Amino acid sequence: EWLPQNRADVWEFQADHRFGEAMAEAKYFFMTHAEALLHGDLHTGSVMVRKPEGSNEADSVKVFDSEFAFYGPVAFDVGATWANYAIAAARAYALGEDDRAHWCLGLVGETWHAFEAEFRRRWPERRDPRLWDEEFLNRLLQRWRNESWLFAAAKMSRRIIGAAKTTDIETLPPEIREGAARGVLRMARSAVVERWADSTPNHFQELAEWLLVEARTS
């Protein structure tokens, strides 16, 4: 259950028809776009990274808890990860850890750019280069980037007022939890609109920083 102080935020959320339409689109993509084998419940707690002492590079990355794996839209896992960063940033802002919040949101861009670089590296291995050319690749990546905002919005809202709430927010003291929850909900609602104006990770970061800081309470 959400805090009584967030009741008005929930009512505004429920009355947001544009968000409802966007979630219908997200659910349709989820059910019909079998593009890749996905983790299905990806968040930072599902990833283990090993870095040798004295090195800045990881030599091993393991992802576990794959019981929800399925064939679905590529952007689903990407968006889920972005949402996790935003929620972690909301907690950090609520606790006054602004530098940590900025770092969390900076991971949105790092994650996307690493994904895009790896996908482009593997692109020469595609089955039919005559059909799927570089222009097709650019359009595909742009679509996935846009859809990542959509699935991030779905995940953010679900983690605040849905059945699978996040301890990042739930364990905050009520007086600061109120603003953190409000900020995440506002980011979710804004994301489904702002993705059409600018779907870059940098815009996601800037928008989240502004909304989360504006909403925080003390």
Q: Predicted segment positions?
A:
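ATP-dependent phospho-/nucleotidyl transfer catalytic cores
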Residues: 1-39, 50-54
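Secondary-structure capping and boundary motifs in well-ordered enzyme cores
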Residues: 34, 39, 70, 74, ...
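An acidic intrinsically disordered interaction segment
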Residues: 34-39, 43-44, 116-131
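Catalytic activation segment of kinase domains across protein kinase-like and atypical kinase folds
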Residues: 44-93
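Active-site activation/catalytic loop segments of kinase-like enzymes and analogous catalytic loops
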Residues: 75-127, 152-169
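Acidic, serine/threonine- and proline-rich low-complexity regulatory regions
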Residues: 96, 100, 126-147
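ATP/Mg2+ or Mg2+-diphosphate-binding catalytic cores
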Residues: 135-218
